Regions:
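Conserved donor NDP-sugar-binding/catalytic core segment of glycosyltransferases
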Residues: 100-129
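Acidic helix N-cap motif at the loop->helix transition within catalytic regions
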Residues: 16, 41-50, 72, 98
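Glycine-rich, basic loop-to-helix element that forms the pyrophosphate-binding segment
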Residues: 64-81
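Short, well-formed alpha-helical segments that are part of the catalytic scaffolds
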Residues: 11-25, 30
Length: 319
């Protein structure tokens, strides 16, 4: 059986499209829990009226009494999900009709801890702005992959038992975890297989108010200091995964993967802090350890404050 959980905050503009896409799934969820985090627009009214209009007896709307933030609201939702398989949903997205059926099938066939699919990117008008190339095949992903390329929460489905143990062990409070998809996505391989279904299953909306992604994150609009702060957080995050992994007695392969990820991130931090080209040379020898080549280029851009140059090149040649 399936639970779908979704956090909302001032999502009135797009929430009805997402509710429709969940309600009309070919494999209907057995439980939908929506937790609103003190919205000041019409989000709550729209959801309440929607549930009443469609007589959705298995849907529940909860309102936080105080603003908990995105992370704590999703942690709360994970604890409230009742069924064996749990899907996370974002308020602005649209699911394709076979999303729940496709991910449940892979989860059951592979006995995985977590499965995830791929997403179109759409703009505020619902127009597709990016369509990733996909194979349609299922691929197992290891810890090394997920430390660098964890899926976004809206793409995922988990076994409830995995979420329950993470919550009961209070891994939610470990340093570096501030997004539910980072927490659950990085820890899932410590509990079993993680499988990517390389198939487009939803449409993720990009707009100015997004929590997960905005135009600035794609355009070198941050600073060297913000990059340093981010890498320090990543190091804390990897240290937390390492400590949890040691508790769970994982394989030597996973230990080596964690060590490589920590070594690379520490080297990146040294480079940004010192601006010493010597460290850049060291990073070039480890470039395959980066998530993408763009991350290496971004380190160079932020270290030497080349943001303006990078933006002009992006504008001229495209992404």
């Amino acid at each position: 059986m399936i639970s779908v959980v979704m956090a909302t905050y001032n999502g009135a503009d797009f929430i009805l499209e997402q509710l429709d896409s969940i309600r009309t799934q070919k494999l209907k969820p057995d439980q939908v829990i929506i937790c609103d985090d003190c919205s000041t627009d019409q989000t709550v009214v729209l959801i309440r009226d929607y549930i009443t209009k469609h007589q959705l007896t298995d849907w529940q709307l909860i309102e936080n009494q105080e603003n908990l933030g995105h992370y704590r609201t999703f942690i709360k939702l994970a604890s409230l999900a009742e069924h064996d398989i749990v899907f996370f949903a974002d308020q602005d997205d649209k699911w394709l009709p076979d999303k729940t059926a496709a991910l449940q099938k892979v989860l059951l066939e592979t006995d995985a801890a977590m499965v995830y699919g791929q997403s179109y990117l759409i703009d505020q008008n619902g127009q597709v702005i990016k369509e990733p190339k996909v194979s349609g095949e299922s691929r197992e992903r290891d810890l090394a992959w997920l430390l660098k390329k964890w899926p976004s929460g809206y793409q995922t489905a988990f076994r409830k038992s995995v979420l329950t143990d993470i919550l009961e062990q209070q891994y939610t409070d470990y340093p570096g975890f501030d997004y539910h998809d980072v927490l659950f996505g990085m820890l899932a391989p410590l509990y079993g297989k993680v499988v990517c279904l390389d198939q487009l299953l939803d449409q993720h909306r990009i707009h100015q108010a997004n929590v997960t992604q905005s135009a600035s994150s794609l355009s070198f609009n941050k600073t060297r200091l913000s990059r340093i702060n981010y890498l320090q957080k990543v190091i804390r995050r990897y240290e937390s995964v390492k400590n949890i992994a040691e508790e769970r007695q994982i394989s030597e392969t996973d230990h080596r993967q964690l060590a490589r990820a920590l070594a690379l991130t520490n080297l990146r931090l040294k480079f940004l802090q010192s601006r010493n080209p010597f460290w850049a040379l060291g990073l070039m020898f480890q470039i395959r350890e980066y998530r993408t080549i763009k991350d290496f280029i971004s380190d160079l851009v932020y270290t030497y404050s080349l943001n303006g140059v990078a933006r002009r090149l992006l504008k001229k040649f495209g992404r």
